[in-house]
């Protein structure tokens, strides 16, 4: 499968957007990736719409060198996790290594706090447009696209396009390894 041998971390915490989390995780697993759910501490959390989401491991216990990519779903979770340096440092390290990072909906809030959006094209929930622009990104109103190693998705309705771009970016990363 196109992502065999890749390990992808997905950020999770209370209030994560259920579909952005679960559909993306399922698509990555379907493509052959090993997926780990990372958050502040191992636990079972509730998504924004009530689905259970397992947090497998604390983000501080994950070496960024041990993962091949990262996904930052939206919901209410990004506004909470962006406040923790352990989260933003993890995101910044993966970005600095040039590994693919998928960012959808409000996930851009964590990317802003990790200081990885300046100079790039971005999208997400319209509610964070000003935040992205103020952080130095260019706003693009498209369902999903790649800008270097960042894969952007707009909102829940754009999950299929986001997953296509994300899998393609991870497959390209795998081929270049």
Give the role of each language-model region:
Residues 1-97, 101, 109-119, 129-177:
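Extended, subdomain-level signal for the structured scaffold at the beginning of enzyme domains
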């Amino acid at each position: 499968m196109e992502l065999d041998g890749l390990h992808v971390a997905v950020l999770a915490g209370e209030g994560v957007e259920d579909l952005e989390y679960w559909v993306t995780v399922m698509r990555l697993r379907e493509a052959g990736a090993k997926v780990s759910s990372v958050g502040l501490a191992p636990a079972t959390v509730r998504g924004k719409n009530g689905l259970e989401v397992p947090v497998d491991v604390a983000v501080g216990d994950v070496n960024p060198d041990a993962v091949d990519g990262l996904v930052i779903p939206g919901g209410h979770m990004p506004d909470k996790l962006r406040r923790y340096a352990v989260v933003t440092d993890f995101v910044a390290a993966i970005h600095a290594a040039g590994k693919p990072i998928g960012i959808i909906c409000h996930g851009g809030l964590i990317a802003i706090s990790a200081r990885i959006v300046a100079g790039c094209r971005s999208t997400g929930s319209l509610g964070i447009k000003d935040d992205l622009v103020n952080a130095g990104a260019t706003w693009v109103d498209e369902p999903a696209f790649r800008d270097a190693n960042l894969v952007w998705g707009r909102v829940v309705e754009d999950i299929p396009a986001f997953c296509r771009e994300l899998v393609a970016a991870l497959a390209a990363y795998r081929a270049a390894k």
